[in-house]
Amino acid sequence: MERDGCAGGGSRGGEGGRAPREGPAGNGRDRGRSHAAEAPGDPQAAASLLAPMDVGEEPLEKAARARTAKDPNTYKVLSLVLSVCVLTTILGCIFGLKPSCAKEVKSCKGRCFERTFGNCRCDAACVELGNCCLDYQETCIEPEHIWTCNKFRCGEKRLTRSLCACSDDCKDKGDCCINYSSVCQGEKSWVEEPCESINEPQCPAGFETPPTLLFSLDGFRAEYLHTWGGLLPVISKLKKCGTYTKNMRPVYPTKTFPNHYSIVTGLYPESHGIIDNKMYDPKMNASFSLKSKEKFNPEWYKGEPIWVTAKYQGLKSGTFFWPGSDVEINGIFPDIYKMYNGSVPFEERILAVLQWLQLPKDERPHFYTLYLEEPDSSGHSYGPVSSEVIKALQRVDGMVGMLMDGLKELNLHRCLNLILISDHGMEQGSCKKYIYLNKYLGDVKNIKVIYGPAARLRPSDVPDKYYSFNYEGIARNLSCREPNQHFKPYLKHFLPKRLHFAKSDRIEPLTFYLDPQWQLALNPSERKYCGSGFHGSDNVFSNMQALFVGYGPGFKHGIEADTFENIEVYNLMCDLLNLTPAPNNGTHGSLNHLLKNPVYTPKHPKEVHPLVQCPFTRNPRDNLGCSCNPSILPIEDFQTQFNLTVAEEKIIKHETLPYGRPRVLQKENTICLLSQHQFMSGYSQDILMPLWTSYTVDRNDSFSTEDFSNCLYQDFRIPLSPVHKCSFYKNNTKVSYGFLSPPQLNKNSSGIYSEALLTTNIVPMYQSFQVIWRYFHDTLLRKYAEERNGVNVVSGPVFDFDYDGRCDSLENLRQKRRVIRNQEILIPTHFFIVLTSCKDTSQTPLHCENLDTLAFILPHRTDNSESCVHGKHDSSWVEELLMLHRARITDVEHITGLSFYQQRKEPVSDILKLKTHLPTFSQED
């Protein structure tokens, strides 16, 4: 280091100052002038030194005379000469070299950890000495901790401990920081470039098909991008340039592990087994948590994650963290995977994936995952509305930018298909919005509660009492305890079917549904925290909605799609990778509208059992034990009234089935089509009731106020059964009946009330449910018809005794018949209603371009404790109950074995998009 400093730089000082080289003191041949310079303060000496030299003297003689003279001033002159030389050297250094030396010591650039000395130092000792150069930290220390270039680092001397390089040779070495080109070479970063529509994949040599990257930002609430998008330039550009949905609906419960595993399997938690971050399996007698070794037991993981699908079909996968990816599922790990370690820097994860993308073709994965814990971690700690969450959002936006810049460096930014996604949203917690069951139950020592917004309850003594515990008694004890109660206890088979949270032994038989922002625990000591962020609530709540952005050559450019569920993403990724999906809960083809070139063309399922005829019979009229009001128009001549011509039947079909007849996909049921003037039915001769009934209500249709509760007419097209008689239901406190097509509906001025009073239009119905059914038909149906300019209605019974969301087989139904009054009767578990209208309310249901739907799957219960109806008017709770139990058309199809809209002309993929839509409402904000 000495050679660089001014103190040891005499030779460089001479070069810097001109006077020492050119002055007389350096010229030994000009002795007189030299002496004069050495003794300028002595007049006599000066005079003698300036006297002309006697050129006639020989040098030797002159020298001899000088030696003998021994002038005493000689030593003074020599001293002065030496002083002048030293002074000249110093001045030369100061005035001639000062700029050069100062320039060297102001910066550590090129000097990091070298033991040189100067005005400032750049070795490790400078910190203790307090004389580090001003840029020591940025130039020498930060490169060990940061993954990017900045102006301090551009052109740096290569440092062995830096995470990436910004030196001039980094491109040759292949270790440049991701942003080297934009920061140090003036090129534009990915986010600075304009949007471009990538019509065809533009891939480097060796990439036969575009790779797919699934990138999760845990806990990224959909609303974050709506509110803070201006602070998130990279994600906002992906949204603008790619395919985006304002909300992606997670699965219930809205927790991390269940949702991440649903995304990669296309299955609901009840199907793939990961029903929560914490759970107990009574058959395994084992408990699962994210911090236990049990997490690595493959027995917990059902279904087929996409890296297993890829492996089966000859593709490779690389996962840098994803729930389940570090577990040997079906005997398979991803080809490259990392054991989860939350301390691994985000940048290291991104660089690893970029390095995997550079592997040789035969080693390189086709499918990749990335996972970041933010903004979930900050949301939990500080709440969703906090400066810390904003910082976390900006941080992950920078990470996405790092990825995109890295892809650009590899020329993969027009090749790779990116899915940027999150698992769920985030809600603000409050200690005042926590419910404790010990307040209601007293002694709770024998009870275990999994706390949170989707709480569950089981006995402490497991597995012995897991199945025999009195869950129903506790549910009854906790129902309707307070006005405006913010939680509802549910036996799991009564939960809204849209949640798909029942068919698993890992889901305790007793669960709790909570209002937005509310949580539940056994007592205050059993919950972790109450005032920070949380998630897990109903998956339709606005603050639980998740992020989805698709970008790359496989996705459409610059579109915003309607909300869809994350179970659809598995099929989407399979399409991007040209894989055949494993069986799953998604609807393959429902996201075709996101893709530029869909590879899968869906088709309507075929009806597996043809319709049979229900001919008129000449059986004698039977006494049904009914008492009809004389004002009701009776059916005098049944055959005349219902023996319709082909032309009449065509008109009726057009008016009652404008979108086609529901196809029956149940293999065993014998179904015949019954046509009436105002409605049509698909009647099952096996279960003695209609599977469906369809009719249309116009905006101006009138409804009668007549009471039809004890009036039936025999339908001579169907053999009469005791369950079709009024006498069977009279004074029966357990069960009554209801009409599928409402007798109150009067579409003609002359009135044809009696058609809806046929024995083939009734279904067994609990009296408590009749309250809901009547209010819907008398009040809500008219309201919806007015709001939507008419609606088509299809309704019918549901049988889901094993609560798996699928229609039960006829064999199972035979085992579920109940005996009432010595007569077998099959009582539905639910009833469904499908309302279809036009998106454009200036159109009528019979002439729709684009359809709008609203469907319900209503639990058929013996009481209305779910709604705490005591002292309430029907108007205050029935519609709220319907909205809680709304469902997708797809959910209705699965649970009934029916298929809708098969006669619509638009592509089947558009029909599937309609069927998988679930309406949302403002009260869930």
Swiss-Prot record:
Effect of residue 120 to R: In COLED; impaired homodimerization
Stored InterPro entries: Alkaline_phosphatase_core_sf, DNA/RNA_non-sp_Endonuclease_sf, Endo_G_ENPP1-like_dom, ENPP1-3/EXOG-like_nuc-like, His-Me_finger_sf, Phosphodiest/P_Trfase, SMB_chordata, Somatomedin_B-like_dom_sf
Region (Linker): 597-647
Impact when changing residue 195 to S: In GACI1; loss of nucleotide phosphodiesterase activity; loss of localization to plasma membrane
GO cellular component, one term: cell surface
Residues that coordinate or bind GMP: 256, 277, 290, 295, 340, 376, 424, 535
Cofactor entry: Zn(2+)
Glycosylated residue positions: 179, 285, 341, 477, 585, 643, 700, 731, 748
One record GO biological process: gene expression
Residue ranges annotated for the SMB domain, each copy included: 104-144, 145-189
Impact when changing residue 538 to H: In GACI1; loss of nucleotide phosphodiesterase activity; no effect on localization to plasma membrane
PANTHER family for this protein: ECTONUCLEOTIDE PYROPHOSPHATASE/PHOSPHODIESTERASE, ECTONUCLEOTIDE PYROPHOSPHATASE_PHOSPHODIESTERASE FAMILY MEMBER 1
Family label: Belongs to the nucleotide pyrophosphatase/phosphodiesterase family.
Function: Nucleotide pyrophosphatase that generates diphosphate (PPi) and functions in bone mineralization and soft tissue calcification by regulating pyrophosphate levels. PPi inhibits bone mineralization and soft tissue calcification by binding to nascent hydroxyapatite crystals, thereby preventing further growth of these crystals. Preferentially hydrolyzes ATP, but can also hydrolyze other nucleoside 5' triphosphates such as GTP, CTP and UTP to their corresponding monophosphates with release of pyrophosphate, as well as diadenosine polyphosphates, and also 3',5'-cAMP to AMP.
Protein's name according to its UniProt entry: Ectonucleotide pyrophosphatase/phosphodiesterase family member 1
